[in-house]
Swiss-Prot record:
Position of sequence motif CTBP-binding motif 1: 551-555
Function: Transcriptional repressor during pronephros development. Plays a role in regionalization of the pronephros; may promote formation of the distal tubule and duct over formation of the glomus and proximal tubule.
Region (Disordered): 371-421, 529-612, 928-951
Main localization, broad class: nucleus
A molecular function (GO) term: DNA-binding transcription activator activity, RNA polymerase II-specific
Domain text: The CTBP-binding motifs and the N-terminal group of zinc fingers are required for repressor activity in the pronephros.
A UniProt-annotated Pfam family: zf-C2H2_6
Subunit structure: Homooligomer. Interacts with ctbp.
Keyword field: Developmental protein, DNA-binding, Metal-binding, Nucleus, Repeat, Repressor, Transcription, Transcription regulation, Zinc, Zinc-finger
Protein name (Swiss-Prot/TrEMBL): MDS1 and EVI1 complex locus protein EVI1-B
């Protein structure tokens, strides 16, 4: 019904007219009384209206339809220009403006309650960085991504991303992608506790936080700590410093007792399997009575790189070896009741037993031994022979974390408690059970064993375990990193005298070296306990008095007493010049005068000793050990930590200077280098390294107990308890129990539980829990920074990883037309890398020689020596002192390490090797005396054969490594074979640019090697050579040689 057709008078009566309520103030009609009352209370301009003052400022409300747009503006806030559909919404909004606004804009009078609103408002003043919405002009965004998000969610395309399976719509594609995981049947993320699976990793992490008591499900067998998942347990095992790695259930077997552990007390445990090693290296492969593990020393097949069950490892000790006939060994395997009528301990175990019990009183040690003897008699034989009878099933290795391992701490507690009770009752009954005859019999059996054994005592103690095979992988990886991946080849076994120090490589690698080469006194071989109770001063003095002159005394003594810490035998009289003090590993000062007199007595100690032997020998010999000493626990090379301050200097030397070359370590067809030169050089280097304070721990508390063959980190048993447990409880998560090495890692981890994201982006609404993620977000998203530029195609990237991925495409040739595709650029790039590496290598050699040189006259420049300039030749030989033997031998080690790299480079370029042949022949002249240096060149040609023989005798220590035959062929060639015409192709004018740089590097390497060999020759003939004659000869030979001139010119 239209209004113009009917007037009020003619309009049909409305049936709802009687229910309309009329407002007397504004003549509006309402259908209900409540609407009228609300109208009069708020909207109408009556005196009772709460907002009459606000409405007075508005324009009058008109009933015409043409003024509806003006009515909409009546609900607009004057403070922030926001429009509201009704007055009630506007009134609620006005309450927010009554609060105090502390954030004011410096460009306009507006103020805000929140700093984020102020920042967003200030961006609107910057005309270059604001983005307005076309649909709602009031909306201004500081980032285009926020504007696009606003358009998708509020305007066209809102929730435009629909799921094809269920029809559910999403505003973003990421939301749809996350939703589609619900419909997927693949759930790869499984909870390791309750085995519930999830499609997303974030849901699994959220679920794992819900487990409150999951920490009691998975327990670490080494330290007893609880974990919620096996992955966290495996991660914990990599850094586990638990003490049970080195206790009876760990690396050791029957009868071992380590101090400082409450679960595995000082009482010996019988019949324990290798639970600690089984997780990492598989089951052991030796009988219960043998001293050695049966892993090969350094096998050709290199089984340390593979699981232990893939290779059959033969026994170290042959079946006919006298080791199996030792007293007490066969008895422990045959007799059912193990009576200790004669010493059953293997000789290699007595030193470590004494070291393990050094911090306890004599009475406690004797009582401990008595309990061990009673345990051997009382326990069933099945438990003792359990390990030896299971050798047929040893090839089945136990996986890490499996339930097949049966050793647990709870199984041992009952035995420990009973042993403690017996210790209290029978502790005082043991004093009368040891007689000097039994102690002497134990000593004699040890000496007889040492004389008839295939291996020396030092090598017997340094046994090869699975951990050593694991450490060989690390050595191989280091050698492969520096020198290639050709491999190592062992040598035939040498059944001569033993090494007087722990072998660098296992048994078959070293030849027979005399005992007098390397003897250090006053070293402390005692392993430091994890936790010991302090003794009273009186008791410690009594123990030290009673054991000062006793055998196998490893207690700490004053340096003035010159006591041997692990001598095989020692009389009660003071140490004489005929008695030997074997390898001493303490960090204290040495007296070299005493070491030279103690070199020939080890083989003579059989029966002729005095009978005044302390009863502690019997006490220590009653223990039944399988391993000679605690070996450190070896982890993968990635997780190893080098503790150089706790390493012995000899170990540092062996790791630094005795690395293999790119080929074989020692070629099996040639004899090994001169032993005396080698060992004296190492000895001197060890003394020099000990002079640095960096290798001296404070108060000798961190000295490694026994030098291992490959000591990448100190064993846990050699460190005090306070250092092992330091920080373990400090950085522990209170929610899940995880342990972190640093507080920052714990703080970051706690945010995963609390959900805190304190780092908020100032440009958008995103928040981050890690500040680095926020910085990366601002740099890549908002600032569009691309600081990483490709030097080949000038492309820029925001992250280094993207640039690296791009450079790999250049290397693979996927990007054509680049500089990397040309062969010259590749040669120049590799040449620059090699040249930089060689320069740093030679700088290190040059600094080392300069530091150890004692010449009063400074040496000439090396380049000037090579060029052979006559105006700078050293002619004052009388004023320049000759290097002593020790320093020359130190340089010989550096020469050996260098020549191992040079030989490989020379073999790759036979022409370069022939070019440098004359240089080696001319350097042979310098092994002659000063008189012979003045002979005419014709006399020089006649004496080439004699000089060649002298040079062969003075070969340096490592000239027998790979390519030794080729280097000899080069040296055997006469000087007359090459004339100037034949050498002309090697001059600088005939060389191409591609060959100049490699030839120059090789010539420089050869020159350094030959200069160092001169010092080695001088050490071999100290009476017939002087430094002045050598350098004079070098300059004269260089001047006469065309090849050397050409090399110098290059």
């Amino acid at each position: 019904m239209k209004s113009e057709d009917y007037t009020y008078a003619r309009m049909a009566p409305d049936i709802h007219e009687e229910r309309q309520y009329h407002c007397e103030e504004c003549d509006q009609l309402f259908e209900s009384k409540t609407e009228l009352s609300n109208h009069q209370k708020y909207s109408c301009g009556t005196p009772h209206s709460a907002f009459s003052l606000v409405e007075n400022s508005f324009p009058p409300i008109l009933n015409d339809d043409s003024d509806l747009t003006e009515m909409q503006h009546a609900h607009e806030c004057k403070e922030c220009d926001q429009v509201f559909p009704d007055m009630q919404s506007l009134e609620k909004h006005l309450l927010s403006h009554t609060e105090e606004r502390e954030y004011k804009c410096d460009q306009c009078p507006k103020a805000f309650n929140w700093k984020s609103n102020l920042i967003r408002h200030q961006m609107s003043h910057d005309t270059g960085k604001h983005y307005e919405c076309e649909n709602c002009s009031k909306q201004v965004f500081t980032d285009p991504s926020n504007l696009q998000r606003h358009i998708r969610s509020q305007h066209v395309g809102a929730r435009a991303h629909a799921c094809s399976e269920c029809g559910k719509t999403f505003a973003t594609s990421s939301g749809l992608k996350q939703h589609k995981h619900i419909h997927s049947s693949v759930k790869p993320f499984v909870c390791e506790v309750c085995h519930k699976s999830y499609t997303q990793f974030s849901n699994l992490c959220r679920h794992k936080r819900m487990h409150a008591d999951c920490r009691t499900q998975i327990k670490c067998k080494d330290c007893g700590q609880m974990f919620s998942t096996t992955s966290s347990l495996n991660k914990h095992r990599r850094f586990c410093e638990g003490k049970n790695h080195f206790t009876a259930g760990g690396l050791f077997r029957q009868g071992i007792s380590l101090p400082g552990n409450t679960a595995m007390d000082k009482v010996s445990m019988i019949g324990m399997n290798h639970a600690g090693l089984a997780d990492y290296f598989g089951a052991s492969r030796h009988a219960a009575g043998l001293t050695f593990p049966t892993a090969p020393g350094f096998p050709f097949s290199f089984p340390g790189l593979f699981p232990s069950s893939l290779y059959h490892r033969p026994h170290l000790i042959p079946p006919a070896s006298p080791v199996k006939g030792l007293p007490g060994v066969e008895q422990s395997n045959k007799s059912q009741s193990l009576h200790v009528n004669q010493p059953q301990v293997l000789p290699a175990t007595q030193d470590i037993l004494k070291a393990l019990n050094k911090h306890h009183s004599v009475d406690e040690n004797k009582a401990l031994e008595f309990i061990t003897e009673n345990n051997l008699n009382q326990r069933p034989h099945e438990k003792v022979s359990d390990h030896s009878e299971s050798t047929d099933l040893d090839d089945v290795s136990t996986p890490s974390g499996s339930d097949l391992e049966t050793t647990s701490g709870s199984d041992l507690e009952s035995d420990i408690e009973s042993d403690k009770d017996k210790l209290k009752e029978n502790g005082k009954l043991y004093k009368d059970k040891i007689s000097p005859l039994q102690s002497l019999a134990a000593l004699n059996s040890k000496r007889e064993y040492n004389n008839h054994s295939v291996f020396s005592p030092c090598l017997e103690e340094q046994t090869v375990t699975g951990a050593v095979n694991d450490s060989i992988k690390a050595i191989a990886s280091i050698a492969e990193k520096y020198f290639g991946s050709t491999g190592l080849v062992g040598l035939p076994d040498k059944k001569g005298t033993s090494l007087p120090y722990p072998s660098m490589f296992p048994l078959p690698f070293f030849p027979a070296i005399s005992q007098s080469m390397y003897t250090f006194p006053e070293r402390d071989v005692r392993p430091l306990p994890l936790k010991v109770e302090p003794e009273s001063p009186k008791e410690s003095k009594k123990v030290q008095k009673g054991t000062t002159e006793s055998a196998f005394d490893l207690t700490t003594k004053c340096k003035e007493e010159k006591a041997s810490p692990n001598a095989p035998s020692k009389s009660s009289a003071p140490t004489s010049s005929k008695h030997e003090q074997p390898l001493d590993l303490s960090m204290g000062s040495r007296s070299r005068a005493t070491t030279t007199k103690q070199t020939e007595s080890r083989k003579n100690h059989i029966f002729g000793e005095k009978k005044d032997i302390d009863s502690e020998l019997k006490k220590t010999s009653e223990h039944f050990l399988q391993h000679a000493r605690p070996a450190p626990f070896f982890m993968d090379p990635i997780y190893r930590v080098e503790k150089r301050k706790t390493m012995d200097p000899l170990e540092v030397l062996k790791e630094k200077y005795l690395r293999s070359s790119s080929g074989f370590l020692f070629h099996p067809q040639f004899p090994l280098p001169d032993q005396r030169t080698w060992m004296s050089a190492i000895e001197n280097m060890a003394e020099k390294l000990e002079s640095f304070n960096a290798l001296k721990p404070e108060a000798n508390d961190l000295i490694q107990s026994v030098p291992s063959m490959f000591s990448f980190r100190a064993s846990s048993s050699a460190l005090p308890e306070n250092l092992l447990r330091k920080g373990k409880e400090r950085y522990t998560c209170r929610y899940c129990g995880k342990i972190f090495p640093r507080s920052a890692n714990l703080t970051r981890h706690l945010r995963t539980h609390t959900g805190e994201q304190p780092y908020r982006c100032k440009y958008c609404d995103r928040s981050f829990s890690i500040s680095s993620n926020l910085q990366r977000h601002i740099r890549n998203i908002h600032n569009k920074e691309k600081p990483f530029k490709c030097h080949l195609c000038d492309r820029c990237f925001g992250q280094q990883t993207n640039l690296d991925r791009h450079l790999k495409k250049h290397e693979n040739g996927n990007l054509s037309g680049t500089a990397a595709s040309s062969p010259h650029s590749e040669i120049e790039g590799t040449g620059a890398i090699l040249e930089e590496k060689e320069d740093s290598y030679f700088n290190e050699i040059r600094n080392f020689i300069g530091n150890n040189s004692h010449n009063k006259q400074s040496p000439l420049n090396i380049d000037e020596r090579i060029n052979g300039s006559h105006d700078k030749i050293m002619l004052t030989g009388q004023n320049s002192d000759i290097l002593d033997d020790d320093e020359i031998e130190d340089e010989a080690i550096l020469e050996d390490d260098e020549e191992s790299d040079i030989d490989v480079k020379v073999m790759k370029e036979p022409n370069a090797s022939a070019m440098l042949k004359n240089c080696s022949d001319e350097f042979e002249e310098e092994s002659k005396s000063e008189v012979n240096c003045k002979v005419s060149p014709s006399r020089h040609d006649d004496d080439d054969d004699d000089e060649e023989e002298d040079f062969k005798k003075s070969l340096s220590a490592l000239d027998h490594i790979r390519h030794f035959t080729d280097s000899l062929k080069i040296r055997k060639m006469d000087d007359g074979q090459f004339n100037d015409a034949e050498l002309s192709p090697f001059t600088a004018s005939h060389l191409t640019d591609d060959l100049k740089h490699p030839l120059y590097r090789k010539s420089k390497s050869q020159t350094y090697a030959m200069m160092l060999s001169l010092s080695d020759q001088e050490s071999m003939h100290p009476t017939t050579h002087t430094s002045s004659s050598m350098w004079h000869n070098l300059a004269r030979a260089a001047a006469e040689s065309t090849a050397l001139h050409s090399v110098s010119h290059v």
